[in-house]
Regions:
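Non-catalytic interaction/targeting regions
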Residues: 1-126, 130-170
């Protein structure tokens, strides 16, 4: 395969386009658009073209944090959300959904620097409800230098939310 990369950006050194010629002579073209390229538009785009078939992905940002990643649907002629993020006040990911129905939530601690729990298949509101806690507790948990006293509470999710997968980190 032969790779040809195009650089025309002045604000960054990232590639704008890459063209690969496969062994059978077909071309795969990848085009990139970065948020630095259009300051007024917090959108990142990627387009891949192969055999007259294309895939387009767009990602909207809030500052440096990605919020929603969407993929173009040719049949609907619209973008479909594929990945949505929410963040805590420190910029840590608090929840992610890939389809609007399956959620993964995260709990942080050690002065908001490290995740201590990943809970799959539950919304953040359902997680807090099962624990009998509120967002103030999440803030306190995040600010702790050692969350040992709260790990029993977090581990209780395994019984309280049997449909969820609970991973804890120490």
């Amino acid at each position: 395969p032969e790779l040809n990369t195009q650089f025309h950006a002045t604000a960054h050194l990232n590639p704008l386009a890459m063209k690969t010629t496969t062994g059978d002579g077909k071309e795969v073209i990848e085009r990139f658009r970065y948020s630095n390229d259009a300051v007024s538009s917090p959108l990142y785009g990627y387009k891949r073209i192969y055999n007259n078939d294309s895939t387009m992905t767009a990602c909207s940002y809030s500052g440096q944090k990605p919020l929603i990643a969407s993929t173009w649907n040719d049949k609907l002629q619209a973008y479909e959300d594929r990945l949505c993020h929410t963040y805590d006040s420190y910029g840590n990911v608090s929840s992610v959904t890939t389809d609007g129905r399956t959620y993964t939530c995260y709990l942080w601690s050690y002065c908001n620097q490290y995740p201590i729990a990943k809970i799959v298949n539950v919304t953040y509101d359902a997680l807090l409800s099962a624990l009998g806690k509120d967002k103030a507790w999440v803030e306190q948990l995040g600010n702790m230098t050692s969350p040992d006293t709260e790990m029993e509470t977090i581990n209780s999710l395994r019984q309280k939310l049997p449909e969820a997968q609970v991973y804890t980190y120490t």
